[in-house]
Amino acid sequence: MEQKKRSMKQHYQILIVGGGNAGISLAAQLFRKDKRLDIGIMDPADKHYYQPAWTLVGGGDFDVRDTVRSEAEVMPRQAKWIKEAAVKLEPDQNAVISSAGVRYTYDYLVVCPGIQLDWHKIKGIEGHLGKNGITSNYTFETAPYTFECIRSLKRGKALFTNPNTPIKCGGAPQKIMYLASDYWRKHGVLKDIEVHYYSGGGVIFGVKKYADTLLKVIQRYGIKTHYLHNLVEIRPDKKEAVFEVYKDGQVVDQVTDTYDMIHVTPPQSAPDFIKNSPLAVPGNPLGWVDVDKHTFQHVRYPNVYSIGDASSTPNAKTGAAIRKQVPVLVEQLFSQIRAGKPAAAQYNGYGSCPLVTGYGRLVLAEFDYNNQPVETFPFDQSKERWTMYQLKRHVLPWLYWNRILKGTA
């Protein structure tokens, strides 16, 4: 092992931290433009997941086994895979220290390790997730259990939570609630189940055009909404959930509700190794990488970039956003490498959220930094459509594995 460690190449023209959607598709697109590039990808993961399908897994409409492949299978052939985790960023020395204690240096660094799930911020959940009615679509292991909970509930109370931090796939906490409600409606038990949505946010969705449709969906299923309520504790023995209530940014109250099943969306933040580095936004406890929102260039370290869920860009943290971010970053990197200056290419904050509102129903929300719709199709995408559900269920997973990760979409 020591011999292998020493012989491993330790300097890269471009070092990418993170082998998820952002890191793999970025490397693939870079190599398509120039196969001679010297790129290292640092990620310890054995497996690569297609996470957007976990909502459908939780709704019993997608096989969880089809959401995973080996990381080796998606790694671009020309890239050097550093199968270690980043533990320390030293941008003043152009260096990253790995979990193996190796110091890797770079000409350009791209930080895209994804987002961290902060389960520790919910008291009492440790050791109880995935049993006794406590579930989440945010892990590969527990998404199938969500459907078990939905299927077995015939009467009682179901809670669906959304934290007060930015999260990946902002619509996910409510999408599973709509699928569950539709399942119960189809099986004639919705009238015997109280469905509650507890959200740390202040609105159902940030873009009015789509929010108007979602409010009708909520009405259709008889869902009770509680905004500015943030889950802080679960008491599994009593089947109770505790929420802090916010007003004007301050906690003003604490409320407790009972549940028979609870779908939890954990608070999220940048990984700790970013929070504890000079790359994080100063004074922001969530620790996002501090970059220009149009070019992804770090505001203090010009040879450092960040895209995807860990960056400070204020867009929706979705795979669709990454798909629009990657070509811009490719242009920026090539311009820096070849001409020593930024490219004209800019990112407009595009994000997309395929909002599942029931089985065979979907609202395809697409919007920019100004929360203005930027729609792909020539019809009104705020309407629930069967065709858009098929897009999410069949087309997008294929596109991900066969085009996006290969740098051709």
Regions from the PLM with identified roles:
Residues E2-K80, N164-K208:
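Beta1-alpha1 glycine-rich phosphate/pyrophosphate-binding loop at the start
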Residues E2-Y12, A79-K175, L179-G188, H263:
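FAD-binding core/adjacent interface of flavoenzyme oxidoreductases
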Residues G19, A100, P113-G114, V245, ...:
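Glycine-rich, N-terminal phosphate-binding loop of Rossmann-like dinucleotide-binding domains
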Residues G127-K154, T258-K324:
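FAD-site-proximal beta/loop scaffold in flavoenzymes
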Residues V330-A409:
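C-terminal, flexible cofactor-proximal segment of oxidoreductases
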